[in-house]
């Protein structure tokens, strides 16, 4: 499993709208692609401008197979409906490793 981890800066007064539009537009589009497993939105109660998106993919290849044109089109639709650009301030990729549990 691969984790796509994005930290964004969003105006505090627009945070709820951002989360709603992100679910309607981005999550819907991502979920239509093979390999999409789930997505979570984390908010930091101490930093009202911070939103973290945690997206789980079955494989890196499936994640990276989304056509760039589709990403650009989705970004354009999101910007048009949200009305403001959310700034990605940090992004990372993680692999989830699981090892057999040793019984004692």
Predicted regions and their residues:
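Short, flexible segments with low predicted structural confidence
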Residues: 1-2, 18, 34-35
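Short, well-ordered beta-strand segments in beta-rich or mixed alpha/beta enzyme
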Residues: 2-9, 39-69
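Short acidic/polar alpha-helix capping motifs at helix-coil junctions
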Residues: 2-5, 15-16, 93
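Intrinsically disordered, low-complexity regions of eukaryotic proteins
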Residues: 6, 42, 89-95
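Short, surface-exposed ligand-recognition loops at beta-strand->loop->(often short) alpha-helix junctions
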Residues: 9-22
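An amphipathic, aromatic/His-enriched active-site/gating alpha helix that lines ligand/cofactor pockets
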Residues: 24-36, 56-92
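Short, low-order "capping/linker" segments at domain edges
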Residues: 95-104
């Amino acid at each position: 499993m691969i984790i796509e981890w994005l930290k964004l800066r969003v105006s505090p007064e627009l945070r709820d709208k951002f989360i709603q539009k992100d679910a309607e537009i981005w999550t819907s589009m991502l979920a239509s692609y093979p390999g999409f497993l789930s997505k979570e939105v984390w908010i930091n109660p101490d930093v009202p401008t911070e939103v973290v998106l945690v997206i789980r993919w079955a494989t890196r290849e499936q994640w990276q197979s989304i056509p760039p044109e589709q990403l650009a089109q989705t970004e354009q639709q999101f910007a048009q409906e949200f009305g403001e650009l959310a700034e990605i301030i940090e992004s990372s990729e993680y692999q989830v490793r699981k090892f057999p549990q040793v019984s004692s």
